[in-house]
Amino acid sequence: MPNNYRLAKVSSLLKKEITLILQNELEIDLISDHFVNISKIDLSGDLQHCKIYITSTAQEKVKKEIVSNLNTAKSSIRHSLGKRIEMRRVPEIIFKDDVVLDKGLSVLKLLDELKNKNQNHNVEDEDAKS
């Protein structure tokens, strides 16, 4: 079983190379029309399986379509990856939508709403005291 350092190095290499493949070799219109980024790579300890989390500026429906198209093209992506890196076996890959960014944005929106409500409440209290 590889150590954490090796996992981190291989994950970093995979992220770099897959990003280059998405930018230069893959011809999917949705990817070229929207900003698509690899946010995270989960690589199994045996280096055989790789989950690639994608973020995008696209709407939710389009994001799901992007992930679906990437999963359809994963065999050609894996083939290109095999040509670019030296590994005994290129890991099986699966693309997933990274919902962490969306959840974070919704939490920030809720916090802003609470802040605005609190400010409005404070203004009403000051007006009532006057």
Curated annotation (Swiss-Prot):
Belongs to the RbfA family. Its main location: cytoplasm. Transmembrane segments: none annotated. This is Ribosome-binding factor A. One of several proteins that assist in the late maturation steps of the functional core of the 30S ribosomal subunit. Associates with free 30S ribosomal subunits (but not with 30S subunits that are part of 70S ribosomes or polysomes). Required for efficient processing of 16S rRNA. May interact with the 5'-terminal helix region of 16S rRNA. GO terms for cellular component: cytosol. It is found in: Cytoplasm. Monomer. Binds 30S ribosomal subunits, but not 50S ribosomal subunits or 70S ribosomes. It holds the Pfam family RBFA. InterPro entries: KH_dom-like_a/b, RbfA, RbfA_dom_sf, Ribosome-bd_factorA_CS. GO terms for molecular function: ribosomal small subunit binding. It comes from Prochlorococcus marinus (strain MIT 9215).
